[in-house]
Protein backbone atom coordinates (compact mmCIF):
# COMPACT_ATOMS: atom_id res chain seq x y z
CA UNK A 1 0.00 0.00 0.00
CA UNK A 2 1.07 3.57 -0.59
CA UNK A 3 2.59 5.35 2.42
CA UNK A 4 2.92 8.89 1.07
CA UNK A 5 -0.17 9.75 -1.02
CA UNK A 6 0.22 13.43 -0.14
CA UNK A 7 3.06 13.84 -2.64
CA UNK A 8 0.60 13.66 -5.56
CA UNK A 9 -2.05 15.93 -4.01
CA UNK A 10 -3.04 18.91 -6.13
CA UNK A 11 -3.91 20.85 -2.98
CA UNK A 12 -0.75 21.50 -1.00
CA UNK A 13 -2.19 24.30 1.16
CA UNK A 14 -1.01 24.32 4.77
CA UNK A 15 -3.36 23.00 7.45
CA UNK A 16 -5.39 25.84 8.92
CA UNK A 17 -5.47 25.63 12.70
CA UNK A 18 -8.83 26.67 14.25
CA UNK A 19 -8.76 30.14 15.78
CA UNK A 20 -9.96 28.74 19.13
CA UNK A 21 -10.60 25.30 20.60
CA UNK A 22 -14.26 26.13 21.18
CA UNK A 23 -16.28 23.76 19.02
CA UNK A 24 -19.63 22.11 18.49
CA UNK A 25 -20.89 18.81 17.07
CA UNK A 26 -23.71 20.01 14.85
CA UNK A 27 -26.59 18.93 12.67
CA UNK A 28 -26.99 20.53 9.26
CA UNK A 29 -29.78 22.79 10.55
CA UNK A 30 -27.69 24.26 13.39
CA UNK A 31 -25.93 27.06 11.50
CA UNK A 32 -27.28 29.82 13.72
CA UNK A 33 -26.31 27.95 16.90
CA UNK A 34 -22.69 27.81 15.79
CA UNK A 35 -22.64 31.50 14.93
CA UNK A 36 -24.40 32.58 18.11
CA UNK A 37 -22.03 30.58 20.32
CA UNK A 38 -18.99 31.92 18.54
CA UNK A 39 -17.41 28.53 17.88
CA UNK A 40 -14.50 28.22 15.49
CA UNK A 41 -14.63 24.48 14.97
CA UNK A 42 -17.59 22.24 14.07
CA UNK A 43 -17.98 18.51 13.53
CA UNK A 44 -20.47 17.33 10.91
CA UNK A 45 -21.76 13.76 10.53
CA UNK A 46 -21.76 12.48 6.96
CA UNK A 47 -24.16 9.60 6.32
CA UNK A 48 -22.13 7.64 3.81
CA UNK A 49 -24.77 5.82 1.78
CA UNK A 50 -27.05 8.84 1.43
CA UNK A 51 -24.63 10.36 -1.05
CA UNK A 52 -25.47 7.82 -3.74
CA UNK A 53 -28.48 8.67 -5.90
CA UNK A 54 -28.92 10.80 -8.99
CA UNK A 55 -28.23 14.27 -10.30
CA UNK A 56 -24.42 14.32 -10.17
CA UNK A 57 -22.31 12.02 -12.33
CA UNK A 58 -18.77 11.35 -11.14
CA UNK A 59 -16.10 9.60 -13.16
CA UNK A 60 -13.60 7.59 -11.16
CA UNK A 61 -11.15 4.93 -12.29
CA UNK A 62 -12.99 4.37 -15.56
CA UNK A 63 -16.47 4.07 -14.04
CA UNK A 64 -19.34 6.50 -13.59
CA UNK A 65 -20.92 6.84 -10.14
CA UNK A 66 -24.13 8.72 -9.43
CA UNK A 67 -24.56 11.00 -6.44
CA UNK A 68 -27.65 12.50 -4.84
CA UNK A 69 -27.66 16.13 -5.96
CA UNK A 70 -29.93 17.46 -3.23
CA UNK A 71 -27.99 15.76 -0.42
CA UNK A 72 -24.63 16.90 -1.77
CA UNK A 73 -25.77 20.47 -2.31
CA UNK A 74 -27.15 20.63 1.23
CA UNK A 75 -23.73 19.70 2.59
CA UNK A 76 -22.12 22.14 0.14
CA UNK A 77 -24.21 25.00 1.45
CA UNK A 78 -23.67 24.30 5.13
CA UNK A 79 -19.94 23.56 4.94
CA UNK A 80 -19.15 26.53 2.70
CA UNK A 81 -21.13 28.80 5.03
CA UNK A 82 -19.04 27.67 8.00
CA UNK A 83 -15.83 28.17 6.07
CA UNK A 84 -17.00 31.64 5.10
CA UNK A 85 -17.24 32.44 8.82
CA UNK A 86 -13.69 31.16 9.43
CA UNK A 87 -14.97 28.01 11.15
CA UNK A 88 -12.94 24.83 10.65
CA UNK A 89 -14.91 21.71 9.73
CA UNK A 90 -14.38 18.10 10.77
CA UNK A 91 -16.34 15.35 9.01
CA UNK A 92 -17.31 12.16 10.82
CA UNK A 93 -18.01 9.66 8.03
CA UNK A 94 -20.49 6.99 9.12
CA UNK A 95 -21.69 3.95 7.20
CA UNK A 96 -25.43 3.70 7.68
CA UNK A 97 -27.46 0.81 6.31
CA UNK A 98 -29.16 1.43 2.97
CA UNK A 99 -31.26 -1.36 1.46
CA UNK A 100 -30.58 0.04 -2.01
CA UNK A 101 -26.81 -0.26 -1.56
CA UNK A 102 -25.92 -3.38 0.44
CA UNK A 103 -22.53 -3.41 -1.30
CA UNK A 104 -21.41 -0.59 1.01
CA UNK A 105 -21.60 -2.81 4.10
CA UNK A 106 -18.88 -5.34 4.91
CA UNK A 107 -19.67 -8.53 3.03
CA UNK A 108 -21.64 -11.11 4.99
CA UNK A 109 -22.97 -8.65 7.56
CA UNK A 110 -26.67 -8.89 8.39
CA UNK A 111 -28.78 -5.89 9.30
CA UNK A 112 -29.42 -5.76 13.04
CA UNK A 113 -31.22 -3.51 15.50
CA UNK A 114 -28.18 -3.60 17.77
CA UNK A 115 -26.05 -1.60 15.32
CA UNK A 116 -26.27 2.10 14.58
CA UNK A 117 -23.71 1.99 11.77
CA UNK A 118 -21.74 -0.66 9.90
CA UNK A 119 -18.23 -1.53 8.83
CA UNK A 120 -17.22 -0.16 5.43
CA UNK A 121 -16.93 -2.79 2.72
CA UNK A 122 -13.51 -3.16 1.16
CA UNK A 123 -13.72 -6.96 1.10
CA UNK A 124 -15.53 -7.49 -2.22
CA UNK A 125 -14.41 -5.89 -5.47
CA UNK A 126 -17.71 -4.04 -5.93
CA UNK A 127 -17.70 -2.84 -2.35
CA UNK A 128 -14.10 -1.71 -2.49
CA UNK A 129 -14.51 0.15 -5.77
CA UNK A 130 -17.72 1.91 -4.73
CA UNK A 131 -16.39 2.79 -1.28
CA UNK A 132 -13.16 4.12 -2.76
CA UNK A 133 -15.09 6.21 -5.30
CA UNK A 134 -17.25 7.80 -2.60
CA UNK A 135 -14.18 8.59 -0.51
CA UNK A 136 -12.56 10.18 -3.58
CA UNK A 137 -15.70 12.18 -4.34
CA UNK A 138 -15.85 13.55 -0.80
CA UNK A 139 -12.14 14.40 -0.83
CA UNK A 140 -12.47 16.30 -4.10
CA UNK A 141 -15.79 17.96 -3.34
CA UNK A 142 -14.62 19.32 0.02
CA UNK A 143 -11.01 20.12 -0.82
CA UNK A 144 -11.69 23.85 -0.71
CA UNK A 145 -10.78 24.04 -4.40
CA UNK A 146 -14.01 22.84 -6.00
CA UNK A 147 -16.23 25.60 -7.37
CA UNK A 148 -19.17 23.17 -7.57
CA UNK A 149 -19.35 23.11 -3.76
CA UNK A 150 -18.72 26.87 -3.48
CA UNK A 151 -15.20 25.97 -2.28
CA UNK A 152 -16.47 24.15 0.81
CA UNK A 153 -13.56 22.83 2.86
CA UNK A 154 -13.31 19.92 5.29
CA UNK A 155 -9.96 20.00 7.10
CA UNK A 156 -10.29 17.00 9.43
CA UNK A 157 -11.73 13.60 8.59
CA UNK A 158 -12.77 10.82 10.98
CA UNK A 159 -13.70 7.38 9.66
CA UNK A 160 -16.38 5.78 11.79
CA UNK A 161 -17.11 6.45 15.44
CA UNK A 162 -15.59 4.89 18.57
CA UNK A 163 -14.23 1.97 16.64
CA UNK A 164 -13.62 -0.24 19.67
CA UNK A 165 -17.40 -0.67 19.95
CA UNK A 166 -19.10 -2.42 17.06
CA UNK A 167 -22.40 -0.67 17.68
CA UNK A 168 -20.91 2.08 15.50
CA UNK A 169 -18.98 -0.11 13.04
CA UNK A 170 -20.80 -3.43 12.97
CA UNK A 171 -19.53 -6.46 11.07
CA UNK A 172 -20.60 -9.23 13.42
CA UNK A 173 -18.60 -11.06 16.10
CA UNK A 174 -14.90 -11.12 15.29
CA UNK A 175 -11.67 -11.55 17.16
CA UNK A 176 -9.61 -8.41 17.68
CA UNK A 177 -7.08 -9.10 14.93
CA UNK A 178 -9.77 -9.77 12.31
CA UNK A 179 -11.74 -6.69 13.30
CA UNK A 180 -8.74 -4.36 13.27
CA UNK A 181 -7.48 -5.77 9.97
CA UNK A 182 -10.88 -5.15 8.38
CA UNK A 183 -11.11 -1.59 9.67
CA UNK A 184 -7.50 -0.93 8.74
CA UNK A 185 -8.17 -1.72 5.09
CA UNK A 186 -11.06 0.76 5.01
CA UNK A 187 -8.97 3.35 6.82
CA UNK A 188 -6.06 3.01 4.40
CA UNK A 189 -8.46 3.47 1.48
CA UNK A 190 -9.95 6.54 3.16
CA UNK A 191 -6.56 7.99 4.09
CA UNK A 192 -5.23 7.57 0.56
CA UNK A 193 -8.27 9.29 -0.96
CA UNK A 194 -8.05 12.27 1.37
CA UNK A 195 -4.28 12.78 1.43
CA UNK A 196 -3.84 12.30 -2.33
CA UNK A 197 -6.22 15.22 -2.82
CA UNK A 198 -5.33 17.59 0.05
CA UNK A 199 -1.85 16.89 1.36
CA UNK A 200 -2.26 18.52 4.76
CA UNK A 201 -5.75 17.45 5.72
CA UNK A 202 -5.78 15.36 8.88
CA UNK A 203 -7.31 11.88 9.02
CA UNK A 204 -8.29 10.19 12.28
CA UNK A 205 -10.05 7.28 13.93
CA UNK A 206 -11.86 7.65 17.24
CA UNK A 207 -12.07 5.53 20.39
CA UNK A 208 -14.44 5.64 23.34
CA UNK A 209 -13.39 5.90 27.01
CA UNK A 210 -12.74 2.17 27.51
CA UNK A 211 -8.95 2.36 27.18
CA UNK A 212 -7.60 -0.50 29.26
CA UNK A 213 -10.44 -1.55 31.56
CA UNK A 214 -12.56 -4.21 29.84
CA UNK A 215 -16.24 -3.96 29.08
CA UNK A 216 -18.38 -6.23 31.23
CA UNK A 217 -19.18 -8.20 28.08
CA UNK A 218 -15.75 -7.92 26.44
CA UNK A 219 -15.76 -11.58 25.42
CA UNK A 220 -18.71 -11.13 23.07
CA UNK A 221 -16.29 -10.21 20.22
CA UNK A 222 -18.06 -6.97 19.39
CA UNK A 223 -16.45 -4.82 22.12
CA UNK A 224 -12.73 -4.17 22.48
CA UNK A 225 -10.50 -1.97 24.61
CA UNK A 226 -9.08 1.15 23.04
CA UNK A 227 -5.58 0.02 23.96
CA UNK A 228 -6.20 -3.30 22.27
CA UNK A 229 -7.20 -1.55 19.06
CA UNK A 230 -4.11 0.68 19.04
CA UNK A 231 -1.69 -2.09 19.99
CA UNK A 232 -3.04 -4.36 17.27
Briefly describe each language-model feature range.
Residues 1-152, 156-158, 163-175:
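N-terminal substrate-binding region of glycoside hydrolase catalytic domains
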Residues 17, 131-134, 139-140, 146, ...:
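Noncatalytic carbohydrate-binding groove/subsite architecture in carbohydrate-active enzymes
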Amino acid sequence: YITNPEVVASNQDAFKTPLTKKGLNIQLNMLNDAFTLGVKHVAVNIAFSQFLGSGIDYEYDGKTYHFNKSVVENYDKVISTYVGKDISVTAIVLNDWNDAHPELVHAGTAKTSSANYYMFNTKTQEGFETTRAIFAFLADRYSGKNHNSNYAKISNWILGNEINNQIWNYMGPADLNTYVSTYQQAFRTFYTAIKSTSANDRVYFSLDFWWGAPYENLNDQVHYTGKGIVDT
